[in-house]
């Protein structure tokens, strides 16, 4: 029987949850059964993990998923956990679990993690003994670094005396191996146009809120000076793609012969006002700055980013921020913990036409950080224009308005709603109308790109 491993898709959620329910039946009769049968993966939680690219699925020739592995990055720091790994009992003992585990550990290594952790039953052959065969060793579960795992076990009601924690150290990747980097999306919590400069650019005020969801950039260093984008991005020729332009812009600051292969996994809707292309470019700048040994300072990198687009500097600096000018004057902000329902209405909104719209308000009085913090400043200058010209965006705003105060991000087309809890965000997303696509994301003060950069900086690639 042949199978292959791929990133899980949202339309596979029900199949993966069914695999988990089938796999847990194998524990009937075990002392842990009473707690195991009470714990199952909610579909909305699985969907969120898939959206973050942390679930891989084993698929047989017919297209049927027969197993999956799910990594959990909530542990933080230089470790990532195996939240769940299951194989359909009818497809057990065929190497599927081993292949899924190796695939997940390989990705974690490329992402700069130092180890992979998990909790499992000590006496079940396909649990602790299986993981031991694949490089995991038992650890002292009372160590401070496993506090998160201990709390998760308590929440699930798992019996402490039957469970063992295990860890697998990951060797640093070779300098010419693929590395994996996040490119987070953003939303604009408000957007005001306060004037127009002599050069024709508009003076803006906005708040960029970074999200924990976005694209993935994969980089492999070359030493022949060549820069290649290996993945096809519909409608975006390689030579005009911001990721290629970013690499070329940084190249003169790197040692002679520095080159790179680039792969882009798009999750953020293109042209949605979520900063996907700008974030991709920033990730290439920040990652290659270290991988190539250019070691430019953040200010210099941000200036290079500004040459690519007004939104690139905020992603280079990696902090949610109050922005002015054309978006390049940034003041970092610490914002309340919030979750966002981001709705993609699947409609193209041409930004240039909006800036030329006669009805666009271009001379609003300047806002202040305090007026934003008090909730007085929430409008988006583009929203009235987009509502009038783009019926699907208007319908998306109207639908989200039924749950709170819906807002447009950037110049659209995506809209969003801020919520106080992930549970409320997921409940709203579950009701998404046909024809729209909903995403749930958490706001982050510090970019996942900078978290990844810290992990990579903690790795001595010469093994010292």
Which residues fall in each region the model found?
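Conserved, helical-rich catalytic subdomain that frames metal- and/or nucleotide-binding sites
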Residues: 316-405, 418-464
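Conserved glycine-rich acetyl-CoA-binding loop
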Residues: 64, 88-102, 111, 122-128, ...
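Glycine/serine-rich anion-binding loops at beta->alpha junctions
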Residues: 263-292, 405-419
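Conserved acyl-CoA
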Residues: 99-115, 287-291
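Conserved N-terminal entry element of GNAT/NAT acetyltransferase domains
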Residues: 1-11, 164, 170-178
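Acetyl-CoA-dependent GNAT
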Residues: 10-13, 17-90, 101-103, 107, ...
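ATP-binding N-lobe of GHMP and related small-molecule kinases
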Residues: 174-272, 290, 294-299, 326, ...
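C-terminal "cap" of GNAT-fold acetyltransferases
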Residues: 114, 121-128, 134-174
């Amino acid at each position: 029987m042949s199978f292959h491993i791929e990133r899980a898709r949202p339309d596979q959620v029900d199949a993966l949850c069914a695999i988990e329910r089938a796999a847990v039946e194998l524990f009937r009769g075990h002392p842990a059964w009473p707690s195991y049968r009470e714990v199952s993966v909610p579909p909305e939680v699985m969907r969120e993990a898939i959206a973050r690219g942390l679930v891989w699925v084993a698929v047989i020739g017919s297209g049927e998923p027969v197993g999956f592995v799910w990594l959990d990055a909530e542990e933080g720091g230089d470790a990532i956990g195996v939240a769940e790994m299951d194989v359909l009992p009818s497809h057990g003992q065929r190497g599927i679990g081993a292949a899924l585990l190796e695939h997940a550990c390989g990705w974690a290594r490329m992402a700069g993690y130092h180890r992979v952790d998990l909790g499992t039953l000590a006496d079940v052959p396909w649990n602790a003994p299986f993981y031991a065969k694949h490089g995991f060793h038992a650890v002292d579960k009372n160590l401070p670094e496993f506090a998160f795992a201990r709390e998760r076990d308590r929440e699930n009601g798992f019996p402490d005396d039957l469970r063992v924690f295990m860890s697998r150290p990951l060797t640093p990747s070779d300098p010419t191996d693929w590395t994996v980097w996040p490119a987070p999306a953003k939303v604009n919590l408000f957007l005001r146009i306060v004037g127009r400069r002599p050069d024709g650019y508009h003076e803006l005020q906005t708040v960029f809120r970074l999200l924990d969801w976005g694209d993935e950039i994969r980089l492999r260093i070359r030493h022949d000076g060549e820069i290649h984008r290996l993945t096809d991005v519909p409608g975006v020729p390689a030579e005009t793609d911001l990721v290629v332009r970013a690499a070329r812009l940084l190249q003169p600051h790197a040692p002679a012969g520095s080159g790179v292969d680039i792969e882009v996994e798009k999750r953020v809707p293109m042209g949605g006002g979520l900063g996907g292309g700008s974030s991709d470019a920033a990730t290439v700048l920040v990652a290659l700055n270290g991988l190539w040994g250019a070691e430019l300072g953040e200010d210099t990198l941000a200036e290079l980013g500004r040459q690519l687009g007004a939104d690139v500097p905020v992603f280079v600096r990696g902090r949610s921020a109050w922005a002015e000018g054309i978006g390049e004057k940034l003041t970092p902000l610490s914002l309340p913990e919030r979750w966002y329902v981001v709705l993609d209405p699947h409609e193209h909104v041409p930004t240039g036409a909006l800036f030329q719209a006669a009805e666009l308000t271009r001379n609003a009085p300047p806002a202040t950080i305090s007026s934003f913090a008090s909730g007085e400043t929430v409008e988006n200058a583009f929203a009235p224009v987009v509502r009038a010209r783009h019926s699907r965006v208007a319908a998306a705003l109207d639908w989200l308005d039924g749950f709170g105060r819906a807002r447009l991000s950037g110049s659209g087309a995506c809209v969003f709603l801020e919520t106080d809890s992930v549970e409320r965000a997921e409940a709203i997303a579950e009701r998404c109308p046909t024809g729209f696509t909903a995403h749930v994301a958490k706001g982050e003060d510090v970019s996942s790109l900078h978290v990844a950069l810290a992990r990579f900086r903690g790795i001595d690639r010469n093994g010292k």
